[in-house]
Amino acid sequence: MTGIFAEQTVEVVKSAIETADGALDFYNKYLDQVIPWKTFDETIKELSRFKQEYSQEASVLVGDIKVLLMDSQDKYFEATQTVYEWCGVVTQLLSAYILLFDEYNEKKASAQKDILIRILDDGVNKLNEAQKSLLGSSQSFNNASGKLLALDSQLTNDFSEKSSYFQSQVDRIRKEAYAGAAAGIVAGPFGLIISYSIAAGVIEGKLIPELNDRLKAVQNFFTSLSVTVKQANKDIDAAKLKLATEIAAIGEIKTETETTRFYVDYDDLMLSLLKGAAKKMINTCNEYQQRHGKKTLLEVPDI
């Protein structure tokens, strides 16, 4: 009978640690890396590079998009920081959990139970906080996507050859070209006519087509950004659903852990299974924290 109780306890405790580890591993390997933020950082810089290539109306939309993308990134990293904090708690508590197996007794078993419940409870709370931050990130992406649709419409109007913005760009090009032609005159009135004729040919044959190409490139940039933002929003939404499943699983195993008797006679294999599960989660936490800049990692107890 004692052996059956021990096996049941091992199964519950091992499942508790592995469920928490699975949620963290999911966050570490998928959710935390689902958005290519390096690409987004470069994109945000590019937004400023094009500021001379669109109308004031479009400029306002671009400014809004930039703010929304930065806000989405901030919210995303809030979630990352929340999980980082959970890792800090987990590594300390699981190290203590492992050490309590030395000269095992009922008091130490009770302490181990408290430790696991604390880890699971903190995991539910921290991952729910992360979920809220991810919701904010997703909402900002969604709003940015709406602004990008409005921007595409605005740029289509701006870059039409009949638009006032396009004509203002052509007028600017003509003014600069004719001013340059006049400045280079050395052959009197006839030279001026010839220079203006050359300038007109350059404007119509080269500069205006180049303007069209440049404006088209700007619109293509924002079209590509729109696709990226929509995909990022879809990825976060899918990840949130998966994370919600992980949180629910932790909540369920926490309830089972609370009703499980911890003080039982473990054999060597049972101890190895429990210590192995705890050490694996410590390593998962260390991996996560190291990827986020932590230099000194907690060593796994070896007993």
UniProtKB/Swiss-Prot annotation:
Gene3D superfamilies: 1.20.1170.10. Disulfide bonds join C87-C285. Pfam families: HlyE. It is found in: Secreted; Periplasm; Host cell membrane. It comes from the Bacteria. The keyword Membrane applies. Its main location: secreted. Monomer and oligomer. In periplasm, it is present as a monomer, while in outer membrane vesicles, it oligomerizes to form a pore structure that is active. The pore is formed by a dodecamer. This is Hemolysin E. It comes from Salmonella paratyphi A (strain ATCC 9150 / SARB42). The lineage of its organism: Bacteria, Pseudomonadati, Pseudomonadota, Gammaproteobacteria, Enterobacterales.
